[in-house]
Amino acid sequence: FSATMPPEIHRLTTQFLHNPVRIEASAPSSTAASIEQYLVKVPHDAAPKRDALRALLRTQTKVKNGIVFANRKTTVALLEKSLRKHGFSAGALHGDMDQSARLKMLAAFRNNEVTYLIASDVAARGLDIPEVSHVFNFDVPIHAEDYVHRVGRTGRAGREGHAFTMVTREEAKYLRAI
C-alpha cells in the first residue's frame, strides 16, 4: 500500500511483479482553493537566484513561518547558510540528517524559534507541521505530485495559504507538468 506512488516506483512494479494491480481511490491530487499560488521568474545562475529568494522573502510581510523547498540536499544547506548570513531565521531539514536532528529542527520550527525551514522533499510528505503560512519553491519540483505535496503544507484546514514557485527558463518543462 502506498498513499502516493512516484513514477519510478510504478515502473519498477511493472518490471518485477507479475500481473500487478493498481487501485486508485481518488483522482490525481490538486491544491486547496484556500492557497494563493504565484510564479516568480528568476535567473538560472545560483547566486542571482538566491538574491531573488531573499528579495522575495523580504516582500512578504505577513509570514508567520515558511518552508523553502529545494530539490537537492546540497542546495538546502547552501540556502540555509545564505539566509542566516543575511539575517533570516532559518534551519535545514533533509534526508541525510539523523532522526534526532530532524526532530529538534521540526520542534524549533513548530515553536516559532525558526521562521524559515529550508527543506528537501522529505518535509513535504507525512510530517505534521500545522499552520504554515507560506511555502516557497526555490526549485520547481521535478514531479507534479511533489508540487501538490509541497504546496499542501500551507492553507490547511481552510486557512489562507501562500505558495510561491521560483522558475527559471530551464525549469519550464517541469512547470508544464504541474
Q: Where are the regions that the model predicts?
A:
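Conserved helicase RecA-like core
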Residues: 1-178
